[in-house]
């Protein structure tokens, strides 16, 4: 990269980071690469699904950086990651020794969902370790963490990560023997083969895999299915002894799989156990920003933030809300989704689903102030002593995390402050939490008092 290209790209990243929320920037911009700038055309390498976001949101950024560095209007030519991967993969396929085709083992249908990848998985603090572990397993299956056990509530991305691991391994090695299956379907297959007296086929199918991906392993924890547990135990041992990768997901930790045999629980803990928790507000905004690319509607930022505040339990609720909105907007022939339109469209879903507790900002200010020895009135005022500033910024952070209020609304409740002040406080506290365990504990203590 030439000096001017480096300056241009640094400026693009700087402008993008100043305009986007951190989680949005991390997902849509962080992994993009400038390949070259030639004849006023910038060639940018990124995931194809992110092209529309760049076209909609970053055109002005590129134009600004172009005029600053080259004193010219810079256009963009996107090179997609998928195209390069396919090209590289085809080369690998062509290079495979012919004797691999003579493999005597029966073919296995992976049952992977090709739409799930690491590239389109939205990362946040609540899932960062799970993503990192999944990528490590995909890069070196059978060696790094075996088994990998991912647990968390429904709709948080466990199935997405399982499929992303499988798709990544398959992309690197098209001949890999991979199987994605739910524990329930494993049970069903076991029952069928028992009835047909074809257990040898089941054993051959599962014990010769390179990668086994089991979803919702808690379904195996049923006392009436001891025969199934025995078969899975033997399958696990056969794969693990041959350094074949096993990844499992569950809605609870291994120690809480109460009806599972102890010897299985022990093996589940041999490798690495990671947790996924519900996405925070900023991650929910990033998820929505990504998902709305699939719809032909305009979603203003205040609508996105409103929706992010309405559903705080899992990703499926967010996806379902967008489908509700799309249905209503298509029927009414609406192009722009305002907060009022979104609220009307999701009303039934909110009534049927779990209610998000309405927490007054005054309560957050009162509890935050009490913890740090200041009053709610002082938090709203302009005084800037150290303990008041910390209490104020923590309260702003919690107001954004625990309510569905927009940034301007939160700023108004803090003495009429600008929305940028709220955003600065939120980002500052979030960064401090990642580096200061004592502050994280303090904030969790305040949250528990508010709830």
Curated annotation (Swiss-Prot):
This is Chromosomal replication initiator protein DnaA. One of its GO terms (cellular component) is cytoplasm. One of its GO terms (biological process) is DNA replication initiation. SMART domains: AAA, Bac_DnaA_C. It comes from Streptococcus pyogenes serotype M49 (strain NZ131). InterPro entries: AAA+_ATPase (IPR003593), Chromosome_initiator_DnaA (IPR001957), Chromosome_initiator_DnaA-like (IPR020591), Chromosome_initiator_DnaA_CS (IPR018312), DnaA_C (IPR013159), DnaA_dom (IPR013317), P-loop_NTPase (IPR027417), Trp_repressor/repl_initiator (IPR010921). Residues 1-77 are annotated as: Domain I, interacts with DnaA modulators. The gene is dnaA. Gene3D superfamilies: 1.10.1750.10, 1.10.8.60, P-loop containing nucleotide triphosphate hydrolases (3.40.50.300).
């Amino acid at each position: 990269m030439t000096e001017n290209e480096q300056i241009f790209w640094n400026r693009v990243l700087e402008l993008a980071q100043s305009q986007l929320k951190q989680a949005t920037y991390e997902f849509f911009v962080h992994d993009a690469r400038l390949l070259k700038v030639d004849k006023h055309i910038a060639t940018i390498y990124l995931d194809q699904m992110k092209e529309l976001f760049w076209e909609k949101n970053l055109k002005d950024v590129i134009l600004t950086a172009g005029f600053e560095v080259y004193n010219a209007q810079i256009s963009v030519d996107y090179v997609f990651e998928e195209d390069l991967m396919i090209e590289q993969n085809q080369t690998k396929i062509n290079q495979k020794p012919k004797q691999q085709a003579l493999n005597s083992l029966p073919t296995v249908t992976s049952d992977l969902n090709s739409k799930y990848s690491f590239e389109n998985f939205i990362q946040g603090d609540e899932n960062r370790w799970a993503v990192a572990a999944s990528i490590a397993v995909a890069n070196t299956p059978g060696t790094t963490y075996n088994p990998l056990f991912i647990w968390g509530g429904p709709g948080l991305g466990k199935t997405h990560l399982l499929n992303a691991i499988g798709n990544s391994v398959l992309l690197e090695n098209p001949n890999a023997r991979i199987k994605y299956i739910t524990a329930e379907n494993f049970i069903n297959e076991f029952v069928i083969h028992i009835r047909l007296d074809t257990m040898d086929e089941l054993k051959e199918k599962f014990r010769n895999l390179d990668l086994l991906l089991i979803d919702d392993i808690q379904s195996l924890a049923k006392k009436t299915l001891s025969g199934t547990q025995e078969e899975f135990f033997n399958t696990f041992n056969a794969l693990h002894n041959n350094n074949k990768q096993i990844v499992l997901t569950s809605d609870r930790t291994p120690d809480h799989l109460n009806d599972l045999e102890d010897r299985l629980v022990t093996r589940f803990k041999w490798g690495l156990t990671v947790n996924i928790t519900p996405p925070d507000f900023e991650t929910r905004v990033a998820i929505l920003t990504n998902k709305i690319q699939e719809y032909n509607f305009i979603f203003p930022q205040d609508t996105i933030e409103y929706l992010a505040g309405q559903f705080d339990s899992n990703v499926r609720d967010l996806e379902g809300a967008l489908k509700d909105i799309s249905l209503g907007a298509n029927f009414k022939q609406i192009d722009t989704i305002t907060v009022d339109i979104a609220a009307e469209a999701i009303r039934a879903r909110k009534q049927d689903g779990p209610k998000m507790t309405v927490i007054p900002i005054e309560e957050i200010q009162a509890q935050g102030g009490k913890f740090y020895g200041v009053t709610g009135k002082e938090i709203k005022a302009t005084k800037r002593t150290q303990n008041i500033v910390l209490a104020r910024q923590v309260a702003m952070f919690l107001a954004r995390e625990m309510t569905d209020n927009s940034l301007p609304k939160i700023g108004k409740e803090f003495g009429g402050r600008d929305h940028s002040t709220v955003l600065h406080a939120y980002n500052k506290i979030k960064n401090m939490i990642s580096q200061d365990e004592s502050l994280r504990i303090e904030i969790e203590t305040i949250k528990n008092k508010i709830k």
